[in-house]
C-alpha cells in the first residue's frame, strides 16, 4: 500500500466548491440582464439566443476586448466594482458604431486563486454594464489557474454579439466633404493608455490616493467606468437616420480611430479647442511631460465617441442626443485630404 497522500484538485490549487459558489452568486446578476430572445439560463454547455423579430436580413456583429492594464490599477487599489462595466463598454461600443444592437455578452475571468467576493463584484459590474447596453449576460468562463497568475490577480476578456439590418449597416462609405463631426464626452481615460498612465504615476512619485482634482480624488477620476453609448446612439440612428459613420475613441485616440471609418480621400479636421479637456488629462500631461500629439495618439483626451452627419442634420442630431441625456458638441468636419496628408488633422493644438 502506498504511503503517498491522496492528492485532490484542491491540493493542486483549484477549488471547485469556490467556483460553484461563484456561479450561484452571479445567477441573479445574469437574470437581471435577460432579453426575451435568450433561451435558458446559466449553466448549460452553450447559450442559446434567437434573432429578434422584425429583421428582414439580420447580420450578426461580434467583438471581443479586454480592459488593458487598467486592471493592474484596479488590483493595486483593490477596487473591483466598475472594471466589469469597462469590459462591457469596450465591446458594445465597438458594436454600436456599425449600427448594431448588442444582444448577448460572455466573459472570461482567469485567476491564480479564486476570490469569490472579488469575482462576484466584477461580474456584478459586468451585469450593470449589460443593463446599460441592453444586452444579456448569457454565460462565461471562470478559470482558476495556479502557477499562471500571482495569487488572486486576475485577467478579464469580454465577448459580445449584436445584430443589425443588412441595409442599415453604418460603414462610413457615405461620408462626404463638408460633413460635420459630433463628439460625445468620455468619463475619463476609459480603458486605454493605462500603461502610460501607470508609468507617469511611477515616475512622478505621486500618491494618487491623496491627490484631488476639481474636488474629486484622482483615483476616482482614473477608475471612472468607461461610458456605454449604446442606447443614445441607437436612438439617434433610429430617430434621425442621419448617421454616416461613428468612431469609438479607444487606444490610439482620435488620430488612430477616426481613420478606421473614413473612406479614401477624406480627412477629419478636428478642433481641439472646441472642448475643455478634463483636468485628469492635464494632470497626466504635466506629471509625465507628455507631448501634445502623443496625448491625442494614446488617450481619448475627453472624447469617447465621434459621429459623422451631414451639415443639414447637425441640429436634429444634437437635439436627439441631448434628449437622450448626452452632452454633444461639434468637434470638426470632413475635408478632402491632400495627397499624402494624414486622415486626421488636429487644429489649435496647444504648444507644450
Swiss-Prot record:
Q: What is its EC number?
A: 6.3.3.1
Protein name per Swiss-Prot or TrEMBL: Phosphoribosylformylglycinamidine cyclo-ligase
Per UniProt, subcellular location reads as: Cytoplasm
* Gene behind this protein: purM
Q: Which GO terms describe its biological process?
A: 'de novo' IMP biosynthetic process; adenine biosynthetic process
Any GO CC annotation of this UniProt entry = cytosol
UniProt catalytic activity: 2-formamido-N(1)-(5-O-phospho-beta-D-ribosyl)acetamidine + ATP = 5-amino-1-(5-phospho-beta-D-ribosyl)imidazole + ADP + phosphate + H(+)
UniProt pathway annotation: Purine metabolism; IMP biosynthesis via de novo pathway; 5-amino-1-(5-phospho-D-ribosyl)imidazole from N(2)-formyl-N(1)-(5-phospho-D-ribosyl)glycinamide: step 2/2
At the top of the EC hierarchy, this enzyme's class is ligase
Amino acid at each position: 500500500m502506498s504511503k503517498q497522500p491522496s492528492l485532490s484538485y484542491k491540493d493542486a490549487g483549484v477549488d471547485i466548491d469556490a467556483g460553484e459558489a461563484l456561479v450561484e452568486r452571479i445567477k441573479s446578476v445574469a437574470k437581471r440582464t435577460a432579453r426575451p430572445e435568450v433561451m435558458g439560463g446559466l449553466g448549460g454547455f452553450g447559450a442559446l439566443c434567437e434573432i429578434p423579430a422584425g429583421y428582414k436580413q439580420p447580420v450578426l456583429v461580434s467583438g471581443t476586448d479586454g480592459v488593458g492594464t487598467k486592471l493592474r490599477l484596479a488590483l493595486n487599489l483593490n477596487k473591483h466594482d466598475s472594471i466589469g462595466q469597462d469590459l462591457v463598454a469596450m465591446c458594445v461600443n465597438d458594436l454600436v458604431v456599425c449600427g448594431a444592437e448588442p444582444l448577448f455578452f460572455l466573459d472570461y475571468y482567469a485567476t491564480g486563486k479564486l476570490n469569490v467576493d472579488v469575482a462576484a463584484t466584477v461580474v456584478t459590474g459586468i451585469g450593470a454594464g449589460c443593463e446599460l447596453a441592453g444586452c444579456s449576460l448569457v454565460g462565461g468562463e471562470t478559470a482558476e489557474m495556479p502557477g499562471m497568475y500571482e495569487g488572486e490577480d486576475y485577467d478579464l476578456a469580454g465577448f459580445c454579439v449584436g445584430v443589425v439590418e443588412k441595409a442599415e449597416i453604418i460603414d462610413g462609405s457615405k461620408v462626404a466633404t463638408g460633413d460635420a463631426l459630433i463628439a460625445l464626452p468620455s468619463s475619463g481615460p476609459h480603458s486605454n493608455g493605462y500603461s502610460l498612465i501607470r508609468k507617469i504615476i511611477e515616475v512622478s512619485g505621486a500618491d494618487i490616493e491623496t491627490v484631488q482634482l476639481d474636488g474629486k480624488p484622482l483615483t476616482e477620476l482614473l477608475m471612472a467606468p468607461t461610458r456605454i453609448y449604446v442606447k443614445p446612439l441607437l436612438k439617434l440612428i433610429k430617430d434621425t437616420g442621419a448617421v454616416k459613420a461613428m468612431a469609438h475613441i479607444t487606444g490610439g485616440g482620435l488620430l488612430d480611430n477616426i481613420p478606421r471609418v473614413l473612406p479614401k480621400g477624406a480627412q477629419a479636421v478636428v478642433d481641439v479647442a472646441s472642448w475643455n479637456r478634463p483636468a485628469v488629462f492635464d494632470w497626466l500631461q504635466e506629471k509625465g511631460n507628455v507631448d501634445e500629439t502623443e496625448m491625442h495618439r494614446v488617450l481619448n483626451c475627453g472624447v469617447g465617441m465621434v459621429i459623422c452627419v451631414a451639415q443639414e442634420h447637425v441640429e436634429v442630431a444634437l437635439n436627439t442626443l441631448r434628449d437622450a441625456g448626452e452632452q454633444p458638441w461639434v468637434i470638426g468636419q470632413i475635408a478632402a485630404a491632400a495627397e499624402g496628408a494624414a486622415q486626421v488633422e488636429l487644429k489649435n493644438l496647444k504648444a507644450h
